[in-house]
């Protein structure tokens, strides 16, 4: 699949099959993430954690459910049944917000690579926020001291055919 086609086809998958992605595909997705632009080239300010363990998913789901209930007053299951999750954590950046931009670039590259490989994906922040606020999960996921989980991506094969939505963003062109 060509790059622009993968970008156009990428959509958020919210229901996955149990089938695990291959190690080769996982490595390709990681390579794409590590090829992302990072402010000032500070790649060492980022850390990637891969989770493929159902027991840990249960703990993450419980923490996410608790966090969402606190924030929104309702229960939601947010793992989407994905067999792989990748968390990207960051040290605080020198410029405000740069850690969020860096993380987003890494995960968008991963999402486009996954789409090109026929792997469904969704980038989301709830699990990263839940891990950030849970010392036990931070320890289980071996998040290094001084790093904060920013976002994660769930990966797997979609349980249904995904049709990308058309999105519009207001554009001003100044000449």
Tell me what each language-model feature is.
Residues 65-66, 102-104, 139, 169-170:
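Short, solvent-exposed amphipathic alpha-helical segments in soluble enzyme
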Residues 1-82, 175:
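N-terminal amphipathic, basic helical "cap/leader" segment at the start of enzyme domains
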Residues 5-6, 12-13, 148-175:
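C-terminal helix-cap and adjacent tail motif
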Residues 33, 86, 92-138:
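Small-aliphatic-rich amphipathic alpha-helix that forms the alpha element of a beta-alpha
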Residues 137-148:
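Short, electropositive alpha-helical surface patch
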